[in-house]
Each structure stands twice: as C-alpha cells, then as structure tokens.
Amino acid sequence: MNPDIRLSQLNSWLANLAGKWSLTLESLAPASSDASFRRYFRVAGTKNGAHQSFIVMDAPPTTEDTRPFIAISELFAQAKLNVPLVLEQDVAQGLLLLSDLGNETYLSALNPASAPKLYEDANSALIQLQLASKPGILPEYSKDLLSRELNLFTEWYLNKHLHLDLNPKQSADLAHIFELILDNNLSQAQVYVHRDFHSRNLMVTNNDNPGILDFQDAVYGPITYDLASLY
C-alpha cells in the first residue's frame, strides 16, 4: 500500500484518539523504522495528567502481524521488564499507540565509562526474563528454525557478501560445525529468548533501565542465545 495512504489512515485513527490522550496531531513526526515494513512515529500528548510523548506503530496488515508484539509486550511486562506498553490497538489496520521509551539507544550511549553499568542493567533484565520463563507460551526455537538461521551465514555472508563458493570439503566441515552448534543449543536449558537482544534494541531509561524493543519474534530456546547477541 502507498505509504501516503497508510499515513492518512494513521492520522484518521489518531484523530479518534486525540481527545482521550490529548494528542497534538500536528506534532506527529517520524521516529524510526526497522528491517521490516513497520514504521514508527512520535506524537505529543498527555497521560495521567502529565505531558509526554507516545509512539505510533504503523504495521501494514498485508505484510505485518501486530498480534505477537501485543502478546509479548504483555508477557514481558508481567516479568517486570521495561517494554513499550500497548495503550491503544487496531489490529485490523495494523496500528498501535505505545508508551515511549525515549531516543537514547545503548549503542549511542556506550563508552568505556558507561559500559559497566549499562551492561549490568542489561544482564539483570535478561536474568529477570529468563526466570519468568515457562514452556508452552512462546514458539520453540526448534532445530529447523535454528538450522535456517545458521544457513543465512552461508547464503548471505559467504556467498553474497564475500562471493565465496565452498568446495566439498569446506561445505562438509561447515555442516559438521553447524551440527555441533545445533546439538549444543538444543541441549541447553530452555528459556524465553528475545532473539535480538543487543545495543540497538536496548534504550537508556531513567527508571527500570534498560527499555527493551523489537521483541515480537521472541521464542523459547537456549539460555545462552541472548547473551551471545548482547556481547
């Protein structure tokens, strides 16, 4: 769908919420985008009598499904993690009004002086998430899914980025390495896995640091996965 049509739909939806949240519609401005078809906007308003900003997620329903984000936001909030709260939703249109965790990512804030405290907070949040884990809630990080993601290394890094074609021995060696990785991951303790727990998705916040974003693809899988992403 034409982005201008989406923006018109978004503005119409916000207009219906403007009274409830005291939204200043003319303040709407792009906030960020990600590797999907989702876009994010920031809009000024009032919550509980205090002036603050909100985030609007624009997720075209032809390509995106907001339901995992909504469900996992609630799940992670129950684990006392600092995630965007879903304040308003229109799943059919792919529009969400979210609480705003600010502009400062870990990536932009990291330096030798700030790193110890930021990573201490990130470790604590990760432990908190893992302690809240229960089987049967999130999709399993299955062998098939892990295998598909390992094969991205061959397809995108070796073949497309480095333009390398492996010979039969190299291919066999890499396949053996992948099997060792798979066996190790599947034998580990299984917990909630954010799956993208790194400095671009962690926000520096004054309270309950860090704010955690981009969790909609979370699964139930190996306990070391998010640590590897973080470090």
Predicted feature residues:
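Conserved catalytic-loop position in the HRD/HxD motif
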Residues: D196
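An alpha-helical support segment within catalytic cores of ATP-dependent transferases
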Residues: L10, N16-G19, K134-P139, L145, ...
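ATP-binding glycine-rich phosphate-binding loop
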Residues: L23-F41
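Active-site Asp-x-Gly
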Residues: V191-Y192, V204-Y231
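Juxta-kinase regulatory segment immediately upstream of eukaryotic protein kinase catalytic domains
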Residues: M1-L23
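ATP-binding pocket architecture of kinase catalytic cores
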Residues: F41-S147, L152, L162, L186-S187
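Conserved protein-kinase catalytic-loop position immediately C-terminal to the HRD catalytic Asp
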Residues: R200-N201
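Short glycine-enriched loops at secondary-structure junctions
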Residues: S33, V91-Q93, A218
